[in-house]
Amino acid sequence: MPSTVEITESLIREFITRAVTDVFRTMLSRVPTFSAPADIGGDKVAKSVGTENRPQVVGTVGFIGEVNGLVYLHLDLAFARMCTCHLLGMTEAELDEAGDEVINDAIGELTNMTVGGFKNGLCDSGYPCMLTIPSILRGTNFSIEPISSAVRHVYHFDCAEHRVVADILMKPSE
């Protein structure tokens, strides 16, 4: 299927905003608010996505096809725990007993649903692609360096008094 719509920054912003809003409203009963994006462009320099020095849980899912890329969804640990408890109907005590793997699974699934919504926007615009399996990164004060040929877009959302950051790396297929 030939590509019919140019992938612009405004289109990417529209797709990720719709995906984050739909997933968080449906799965968490929370409505995130879009904040102005931190425009990084194609810089190879590792840059912070503004998540401060708090422990982070970062879900990532890739997409491959007519356009390739990764979406990293950054949540601070406190919000990741809150999301997990809500998704699974658990108390904080039950979550403590269940351990970090449950948080990883829940954030992996939230990320998968979010990137699935983003991917659907790409497919509907003439860029068919498929998702990769989700993976999780955990840490404090780390940054992600894009490859030189990738274009980077970082979008911030405020949700339940927490910051959610969608860090998108994209490049056309070769």
Describe each PLM feature range.
Residues M1-E174:
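N-terminal auxiliary interaction/assembly segments of multi-subunit proteins
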